[in-house]
């Protein structure tokens, strides 16, 4: 028996303008070299651009995009008897959101364009519509899991 207590689950703080945890998660993921104010600037500019493009609430577009990109299942490499198998595993909601945010930011960084706010807003709008690189990444992950369904018993 371990004598150490279990770690308390940290509650994500919400951002100052939208009072939303998702926005704060985005800011913390987009952050580079500790420049948090720049990260906030990028996110808020992207939200303004989404507001201008879609003429709807940018938070609802953000939620819809993240819901569309969040994977239900993924593959994990597992070594069994000298060979490595890709074993499909279910993903929890927190980990799924984190993956979705990572994929959205990665896809927007790869996009050609002027600045990060513009690229990120375009990626979010595309993801909310059901297209874009991040959605393709999710579908690819689901295909991989489906193809390796035979190894599900190695869990």
UniProtKB/Swiss-Prot annotation:
Disulfide pairings: none
Query: Has the keyword Nucleotide-binding been applied to this entry?
Result: no
Protein's cellular compartments: Plastid, Chloroplast
* GO MF: rRNA binding; structural constituent of ribosome
- Oligomer and partners: Part of the 30S ribosomal subunit.
Family designation? Belongs to the universal ribosomal protein uS7 family.
Q: What does this protein do?
A: One of the primary rRNA binding proteins, it binds directly to 16S rRNA where it nucleates assembly of the head domain of the 30S subunit.
Q: What is this protein called?
A: Small ribosomal subunit protein uS7cz/uS7cy
Instruction: Point out the gene that encodes the protein.
Output: rps7-A
